[in-house]
Amino acid sequence: MLVIAAFAVTSAAAQFNPQQPIPADKDVRTGKLENGMTYYIRHNEKPKGQADFYILHDVGAIQENDSQQGLAHFLEHMAFNGTKNLPGKMLTEYLEKVGVKFGANLNAGTGWDQTTYMMKDVPTSREGIIDSALLILHDWSHFIALEPEEIDSERGVIMEELRTRDGASWRSTMKMLQALGKDTKYEHRNLIGYLDGLKGFHHKELEDFYNQWYRPDYQAVVVVGDIDVDAVENKIKTLMSDIPAPAADAARKETITVPDNEDPIISIYTDPEMQGSKIQLFVKRPALPEQMNNLIYGEMFDVIQAYMTTMENARLQEISMKPDAPFLGAGMGSGEIGVIPTLNATTFVAMTQDGKLAEGFEAIYTEMEKVRRYGFTQGEFERAQNDLMRRAERAYANRNDRRNGEFVQTYLNNYSKNTPMPDAETEWQLDSMLIKMINVEAVNGFAQQVIYNRNQVIVVTAPEKEGIVNPTAEELLAIREKVANAEIEAYEDNTVKEPLIPEGTVLKGSPVKKTAQDATLGTTAVSYTHLRAHET
């Protein structure tokens, strides 16, 4: 296991049990109903007098069969076209009247593995509004009307969305997903579906998807805001109890893993509409097992990745500032790729001038190889440590200013990924300890395990225009081979460590112009007359 190997080289590994779960924040009320539905409730007054209401369905487009492509997203639309208790457009009309505007505050989103419905900034001054918001979550769980005439009416809306979405950026995203999810179901799901399928699917196909996957054991309700936690919990328990539990033989979600590839998978997508040239290099690896996400192991894993990306991005920024830089900008990431839950990656990306992708690719591949061979220096590590500590200190200092949406996202992630949801004090203590405890040898050991020459995916997106020459797959492979066999020097850390003003230097002062006392603060303000180098 990657994190175990990295942890083994830290000097303070015996100070605590890395398999210990991270305790949950006691200010969030959680529970599971008999039908399997999970809930999270928290009182928060940022902003005062408002609350966010969410329901997460832990299913999405990847649960579609071939004849249902696009129907997870279609179903999301239907949730706003009539439910058991709010037929027709009553749902949106009511929420608009109380200030919850469609698009800004009332919305939903369909992904490959999740579908989320949300009402944000809902006023909580009247109990009736809270009751109505919970009733809407109830209907979104299991009581969407799916009236035949509404389904047929919505076909045109979604086909228009397909048309407007089908731009160069979306097409390039789909090409990237096809490369990353090659030989899996992810290669063949585009979220919105295809024109012929949207025109001709039978109503029963949509109903079948709905009945199979919209069920409480794959659902979490989240309410965060200026509410009475006890009262909301009682309302949820009462209101959601009529949602039926799934049958014992109900279908279970399939865990989809991406197969290894020995040779690089290369995707080159050019488009006359594309703005800018970009090349991405992914080094795939399995995601950390979900059961480890809530352990100290998982948090340490994240901190090590933060060290690695912080140091490498500093190197890439240093290169980009040179007059002859091979790219306009570059970056490195490590961890989730945001689409396939079972897949993580070490990712390098470069944005270049049009026609300069080959040079950009050689540069980022060289930097990747440099990290693999030599790792990072102690000086780089110390600067990264200071940076990470500043971030942790800033988060802790702002702990009382967290808005509803930040808490909501934490709880959604806890439900879908088993990531931790500690209180601010626990998070600060754990992160500050790990930042200080981890050493450069641990980060370098980790880097060697997640950077290698197999399981690579190379994705090129660039304009298709006369005069712009983009690299072929063969040329990219040749660059890769060239760098892999090249003699590469280790990174030289030339950062100035000495103070800008040597110790003991006597500086010539400026005359004092005026002083001012502040009795309240007990301070003295001093203004200087700054001398100019030249008088005219």
Labelled PLM ranges:
Residues P47-G49, H57-W170, G200, E205-Y218, ...:
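Active-site-adjacent, His/Asp/Glu-enriched structural segments that form or flank metal-binding
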Residues K26-V28, E34, K48-D52, D66, ...:
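Extracytoplasmic
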Residues A14-I41, D228-Q305, T309-Q317, M321-P323, ...:
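Proteolytic maturation boundary segments
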Residues G298-T377:
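Structured mid-domain segments that build the active-site/substrate or prosthetic-cofactor binding neighborhood
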